[in-house]
Amino acid sequence: MARIAGVDIPRDKRVVISLTYIYGVGRSTAQEILAKANVSENTRVRDLTEEELGRIRSAVEEFKVEGDLRREVSLNIKRLIEIGAYRGIRHRRGLPVRGQNTKNNSRTRKGPRRTVANKKK
């Protein structure tokens, strides 16, 4: 397995797909990286030379990926919580942040249902 940005990328997949295993790199960013590194998208990772891997690594270093990106996202969320912004309050309460309806849905953010027992008469 080739190691790029601290992530083992799969050997048997095409390079453009393998790069998406890095946090912060999607398909379009992977294509951009390969264009800068002058490497074909259809090449398999196992067929890459050390020189090509080096060019890909240097192209990836220009982007904010993995630990730096995760840290930036978490700091942004902490900042929203500290300043008391509406989005920060939604993060703190574990509710959807982007205005989604919460009457029936949003189970992913809320977690499993907590049923409330009926009051006895």
Curated annotation (Swiss-Prot):
Signal peptide positions (record): none
Stretches the record annotates as Disordered: 94-121
Classification via Gene3D superfamilies: 1.10.8.50, 30s ribosomal protein s13, domain 2
One GO CC annotation: cytosol
GO molecular function, one term: tRNA binding
Basic residues bias (residue ranges): 106-121
SUPFAM superfamilies: S13-like H2TH domain (SSF46946)
Purpose of the protein: Located at the top of the head of the 30S subunit, it contacts several helices of the 16S rRNA. In the 70S ribosome it contacts the 23S rRNA (bridge B1a) and protein L5 of the 50S subunit (bridge B1b), connecting the 2 subunits; these bridges are implicated in subunit movement. Contacts the tRNAs in the A and P-sites.
Stored NCBIfam families: uS13_bact
Protein family according to the UniProt entry: Belongs to the universal ribosomal protein uS13 family.
Name this polypeptide is given: Small ribosomal subunit protein uS13
Lineage of the species this protein comes from: Bacteria, Bacillati, Bacillota, Bacilli, Bacillales
Gene name in the database record: rpsM
